[in-house]
Amino acid sequence: MAKIDASKLELTEKVVHIARVAKVVKGGRRFSFSALVVVGDGQGNVGAGLGKAGEVPEAIRKGMEDAKKNMVSVPLIGTTIPHAILGNYGAGSVLLKPATKGTGVIAGGAVRAVLEAAGVSDILTKSLGSANPHNMVNATMAALKSLKRAEDVAKLRGKTVEEILG
């Protein structure tokens, strides 16, 4: 998979989750913030990143930088994905199913943010297991990374698309 140059893309960013976290030290608690951010161009390129800092804006900025480093390309067929897939990360699993035009994005918060940033506008999803935003975002990213077009699979197997699809 070729590395995506985020500087050449018109990216939209969405903050999925901000958490105030505490480190307990001898003198009490030290608070900092973590921000889970998703960036995408709406044309099949999407990335997710985690930023941590003492202040919220700095955590968001770091999260955006991390997301731009972790961009992946998603094979889209029109406004949906080529086939159903299950993505796993930690205790979170996400089932993604292609949908007909006009269905819309049927997904919960963290999964929806990733899919909208990727440019998927018709899809059915089901979140299984953990509802933790970090796990949901990473499970969705894992599923999107695993998607393959029928043409690519046919080429790998040395067959025609008709033979693959039956």
Curated annotation (Swiss-Prot):
Protein name (record): Small ribosomal subunit protein uS5
Protein's gene: rpsE
Gene Ontology cellular component list: small ribosomal subunit
The S5 DRBM domain, residue ranges: 11-74
HAMAP family recorded: Ribosomal_uS5_B
Keywords carried by this UniProt record: Ribonucleoprotein, Ribosomal protein, RNA-binding, rRNA-binding
Any Pfam family: Ribosomal_S5_C
Swiss-Prot/TrEMBL GO biological process terms: translation
Lineage: Bacteria, Bacillati, Bacillota, Clostridia, Eubacteriales
Assembly behavior: Part of the 30S ribosomal subunit. Contacts proteins S4 and S8.
